[in-house]
Amino acid sequence: MRFILTITAFVAFLSGCTETVSRDGPARILAMGDSMLAVHGASGNSVSHAVEQALGEDVIDRSVMGAKYFYALPISGSAGLNIRKQYVEGKWDWVVLNGGGNDIWMGCGCGRCDNRVDRLISKDGRRGTIPGFVSELREKGSQVILLGYLRTPGVISPIEGCRDEGDEMDRRMSRLAQLDRGVHFLSLADVVPHGDRSYHTVDLIHPSAKGSTEIGKRVAEVIRRTEAKTR
């Protein structure tokens, strides 16, 4: 009984970390992913909050700390730890999507990760979990912004060993975006100046409020620039 109550409380906590939305709601931008998007949500300083401020419109943020693409547990996965299950039906013009970092860091320790990366996305960007999910989103009529990986400032960090995998994932997601004009890859490789710790929290993994704001501004610019071309 205690175990069941613990699981129930955990799922309730995860559910409370994501925004709910009505299908008839006014928001047209949906954000999904892991802690890079979810961090600072409670304080109003997340990436999505920065997008809202830049564009002057609502963003529904369904991202969850620790979320992965490969997540087998059904209950907590449905609560958002499985990125694909963060999706909610709606008239989304835009979906902002990140993820895969936890699958690499926690799944293979940024060591022998070739197979894990291939399962996420193939070298040509055409196959894998990420292209499959992006294809589903495109079929629903949404344009997709794929966020690249936030680099460390070049100092000792728990994820410093993941740099090669992050670079390779960026290359593959860029190729995916080249296949479809409705998919936009946003590289974050130049967000953090070398040696500048101010774009990260003290763990040197997650973006600080400053880092989240910068990412959000860049997301908003992609939306603004793309929509200006269609007017």
Regions found by a protein language model. Give the residues of each.
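N-terminal secretory targeting modules
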Residues: 1-32, 36-43, 49-53, 85-91, ...
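Conserved SGNH/GDSL esterase-like catalytic core that processes O-acyl groups on lipids
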Residues: 26-30, 36-128
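Alpha-helical scaffold elements within enzyme catalytic domains, especially in hydrolases
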Residues: 50, 136, 175-176
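Generic structural signal for well-ordered alpha-helices
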Residues: 83-84, 130-134, 170
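Active-site segments of SGNH/GDSL-like serine hydrolases
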Residues: 98-102, 133-166
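Catalytic His-Asp segment of secreted/periplasmic serine-dependent ester chemistry enzymes
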Residues: 149-231
